From Swiss-Prot:
It is an enzyme of class 2 (transferase). Pathway: Cofactor biosynthesis; biotin biosynthesis; biotin from 7,8-diaminononanoate: step 2/2. Gene3D superfamilies: Aldolase class I. It catalyses: (4R,5S)-dethiobiotin + (sulfur carrier)-SH + 2 reduced [2Fe-2S]-[ferredoxin] + 2 S-adenosyl-L-methionine = (sulfur carrier)-H + biotin + 2 5'-deoxyadenosine + 2 L-methionine + 2 oxidized [2Fe-2S]-[ferredoxin]. This is Biotin synthase. Residues 49-282 form the Radical SAM core domain. One of its GO terms (biological process) is biotin biosynthetic process. Catalyzes the conversion of dethiobiotin (DTB) to biotin by the insertion of a sulfur atom into dethiobiotin via a radical-based mechanism. PROSITE patterns: RADICAL_SAM.
Amino acid sequence: MKEIKLNSDSLEIYEKSVSEKLNRNDFIKLWDLDLNDLLDISYNLKKLFNKEKIDLCSIMNAKSGICPENCIFCSQSKHNTSKIDTYGLKSKEEILKNAKSVEKYSNRFSIVVSGKTVTDLEFEKIIESIEEIQNKTKLRVCVSLGLLNKDKLKALKERNVRIHNNLETSENYFKNICTSHDYSEKIKVILEAKKIGLEMCSGGIFGMGETIEDRVDLFLDLKKLGVDSVALNLLNPIYGTKIYEKIKSGDISPINSTDALKSICIARIALPNKVIRLCGGREHVLKDMQKYSLLALDGLMIGNYLTTNGQNIQSDLKMIEEMGFER
């Protein structure tokens, strides 16, 4: 990438971001800036802290559907009526095969399961899969296993695994998307994981009817929690989910590409030294503007998502190369 010079106002924001002198109101006011200015600031922050690289990760839906939780955005919730494949925990052979299929492209591989948490037997089998991947590939392993207790977190720490647990949105807005568990339960797990010394990935979803204030509050919570990686998703409303109906009826407006890019940039400015990763929904929301998100990002999730298809991996690799970034 060529050097992008900042105008005086943008330079001031950049410098205050680096020195952590921006407050909640400052982040909210960024929404009124021109998108190009936000992208310029974001790229300079990315270059300062995380250079010109785009880290790639992949996930596998290792246990799908019949989730007892009532998240209105999730096609795997039994409270929604989306038509998806449902199955129990995949075998370690199937999980290893999936990991090997993306090893050529990806640096990280995450085992994701549906449900509020995992049983002891499921956890034992997942540990076996983790060890298989670590022994037979060069991939770094992540897991998204719901609300885990201290013993399970310690077992994952012993195996140098990164934990993923999305906050999804702000504490204030969370009750609008889920009532079967609450925000504080997620915070408790993240704090316990950090206390044990686990690497932590957390983030949220844009486009569920939340305000820019909610998004900023999410970023500030992630900052306070000291997460290592921030996973950002853009809502791709799936037929059969409660949120699909809310968007169809006009109760919630779908997020557009400009709003999505601005939100990604504000995340970068609020969390300048964290790994910012864009995951699900980017193809649906950003379309041909995806490439501009790379100016603010350190990572992309590639391949398929939990119950929806992702962009062709070769297209992602070409996009990264054309924007002048390395992987």
